[in-house]
A protein has these predicted regions:
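C-terminal folded interaction/catalytic domains of modular proteins
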Residues: 1-169
Length: 169
């Protein structure tokens, strides 16, 4: 059963390889999500054209918060370039991307890997451990969750709950 779950997780992750999630962009009536992604690309110095985007839409959420945008790129290379440049958004205001948004809106824009549900759960648990000061760093690369317990150079890949449990001991 465990192998079946692992195979399902790997297959789901493979289907999300070209995807990123963009959080923090408020919904506007008549919005053009492809244009928003292109503007974000300009802001982070990544040349994105409409031909680079396979599909872009908002995800449904159970809570009434701003729905994230999911982008599927046509090439893995463009997805990686966009994802790796995400740190350039740290000082960007939403009004710099969407002119119709008031300047008072100070929320940040985040770009994340689009993770399979199981890996998203592992990421949430790892982040809780980081907040509890049990881990120094938590991040994802290509849908895989990595952590550092100390500042040592070698990260630990987290595939299952017991990987995190072993780090806690």
């Amino acid at each position: 059963m465990r192998n079946l779950q692992f195979d399902h997780d790997a297959l789901e992750e493979c289907t999300k390889k070209f995807n990123v999630e963009v959080h923090g962009i408020p919904e506007c009536e008549g919005e053009n999500l492809a244009d928003i992604i292109i503007k974000i690309g300009q802001k982070i110095s990544v040349d994105i054209t409409s031909e680079d985007i396979d599909i872009v839409h908002r995800l449904r959420k159970k809570t009434p918060t701003t729905k994230p945008i999911i982008v599927r790129f046509n090439s893995y290379r463009k997805k990686r370039e966009f994802y790796q440049a995400r740190f350039n958004l740290k000082t960007t205001k939403i009004s710099e991307i969407i002119e119709s948004v008031r300047h008072e809106v100070e929320a940040r824009i985040y770009i994340n890997d689009n993770l399979a549900q199981r890996r998203q759960e592992l990421l949430v648990k790892a982040r809780k451990m980081r907040k509890a000061k049990n881990l120094v760093r938590v991040w994802t690369v290509d849908g895989k969750v990595f952590v550092r317990k100390t500042e040592e150079p070698r990260p630990v890949r987290i595939s299952e709950d017991w990987d995190l449990e072993n780090l806690a001991t």
